[in-house]
A protein has these predicted regions:
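Outer-membrane beta-barrel porins/channels
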Residues: 3-11, 21-182
Length: 182
């Protein structure tokens, strides 16, 4: 609950909502030799799936900023297949893809913003409005890991890592709804 100096109060209990998908991470890796592929144990493949944001916020229609937003959702999923190779004992190289998408399997599968129309353009004030959209975009990443110093047991004491991630731009395709109508 919040009350400003003028006495306007906003209460929010998220209406029982939980961010869908919640910020979460799932990682799987496997050494190719352990999978029976090749004889070298210096190559590993991996797959990561996570939701980097998991954003869901709601405010009551009576809030002082309802003409700006009453609900915002950003249900993005990042799928990252990758491969890593260790050409030298102290150097590892990694390459991977970043696939950003909105999935209907989790939530509504779109970026969404809802608000109350302030009035004008022939739309009555207070009409529920919704902007939404979805897309899929891809990027890539490359990384290096250098271990210049190890202890007597061969465990790393110092690791130096570098990573590059390319840009991936989502060009949202969606709709504007006024009172539930396109």
């Amino acid at each position: 609950s919040f009350q400003n100096g003028a006495g306007t109060q906003a209460n929010g209990d998220l209406r029982g909502s939980v961010a869908v998908p919640p910020p979460s991470n799932v990682y799987m890796t496997a050494n190719l030799k352990d999978l029976g592929i090749g004889s070298s144990d210096s190559t590993t493949i991996g797959l990561a799936v996570f939701s980097p944001f998991g954003t869901l916020t709601r405010w009551p229609d009576s809030s002082p900023f309802s003409t700006a937003t009453t609900k915002a959702a950003f249900e993005l999923i990042d799928i990252r297949p990758s491969i890593a190779f260790r050409p030298l004992p102290d150097l590892a190289i990694g390459l991977g893809a970043d696939i950003y998408t909105f999935s209907g399997a989790l939530g509504e599968g779109q970026v969404e913003r809802q608000f109350r129309w302030p009035g004008g353009l022939g739309i009555p004030a207070g009409t529920g409005m919704e902007l939404n959209g979805r897309d899929t975009a891809a990027g890539f990443n490359a990384s290096l890991l250098y271990t210049p110093l190890r202890n007597g047991d061969g465990r790393p004491l110092v690791n130096i890592g570098l990573i590059y991630r390319s840009q991936a731009t989502l060009h949202l395709d969606g709709q504007l709804l006024a009172g539930g109508t396109r």
